[in-house]
Amino acid sequence: MNTLKFTKMHGLGNDFMVIDAVSQDFTPEDAPIAAWADRFRGVGFDQLLVVGRSETEGVDFRYRIFNADGSEVGQCGNGARCFARFVADKGLTDKKEICVETANGVIFPKLSDNGMVTVNMGKPRFMPSEIPFVPESGEGDDACIYGVHLESGIQPVSCVNMGNPHAVIVVDDVECAQVRETGSLIEPHRQFPERVNVGFMQIVSRTAIRLRVFERGVGETQACGTGACAAVVAGIRLGLLDEGKTVEVILPGGTLYIEWACGGDVMMTGPAETVFEGELAYS
């Protein structure tokens, strides 16, 4: 029986178990991820992040993400910031800006001296086939609003892919939003073949929103980086937020800063913090 070193990190309360697969042998497909994620009998986390070397020329690292239920996903914004902080703190790179390969493309995290991390999250995608989403109300491919057919009626959502699928719902007050009830109905809905993250967005001003997110395979979390990006993009497309301005996204775990100009890449800035270092038995 060998030991496996790991680091517990969080980005605004969205917490991660981070494993260095560059300096030690680790195969996530063989790991009991769901057991490790258990908050009473394991390490406890929303997602497992695996740091590996990329085989692609010009790319510094490969970034793999696994939900608490063991399912692999293509992107995680809060995780991307923790990933960048981890490789810098562990001396795996001396670069301030790194090139990181994910299952859904390349991202470019940049570390600031003040502890904040800015990540170029790439371009959002909107085509139903790119979400993926199956329209059932006759909407066109470029619609800003689609209908999700629930037993209680049709729920309007804005669909955005930020490396993973998001459905954004505009609400009057996030504190009163039925996040768990509605999120648990939409997350596995037949119109989202790969399931979906569900965001509940309250407009505070042209440059500020409040947001709660019911994450795919996890449930509601303290913060969701890609969810914050998706919400701001949706708000701009709906004419509710200012394009090209920095939008303050207030989540239960803290605040992120998102900027997007139509047709461009989405920029996300926020903190990443280490909680503790640990070891566990692993064979």
From Swiss-Prot:
The active site is at 76 (proton donor), 224 (proton acceptor). One of its GO terms (biological process) is lysine biosynthetic process via diaminopimelate. It is found in: Cytoplasm. The record marks 166, 215 as: Could be important to modulate the pK values of the two catalytic cysteine residues. GO terms for cellular component: cytosol. Its main location: cytoplasm. GO terms for molecular function: diaminopimelate epimerase activity. InterPro entries: DAP_epimerase_AS, DAP_epimerase_DapF. Pathway: Amino-acid biosynthesis; L-lysine biosynthesis via DAP pathway; DL-2,6-diaminopimelate from LL-2,6-diaminopimelate: step 1/1. Substrate binds at residues 14, 47, 67, 77-78, 164, 197, 215-216, 225-226. Keywords: Amino-acid biosynthesis, Cytoplasm, Isomerase, Lysine biosynthesis. Pfam families: DAP_epimerase. Its EC number is 5.1.1.7. It catalyses: (2S,6S)-2,6-diaminopimelate = meso-2,6-diaminopimelate. It is an enzyme of class 5 (isomerase). NCBIfam families: DapF. Belongs to the diaminopimelate epimerase family. Homodimer. Catalyzes the stereoinversion of LL-2,6-diaminopimelate (L,L-DAP) to meso-diaminopimelate (meso-DAP), a precursor of L-lysine and an essential component of the bacterial peptidoglycan. This is Diaminopimelate epimerase. It comes from Neisseria meningitidis serogroup A / serotype 4A (strain DSM 15465 / Z2491).
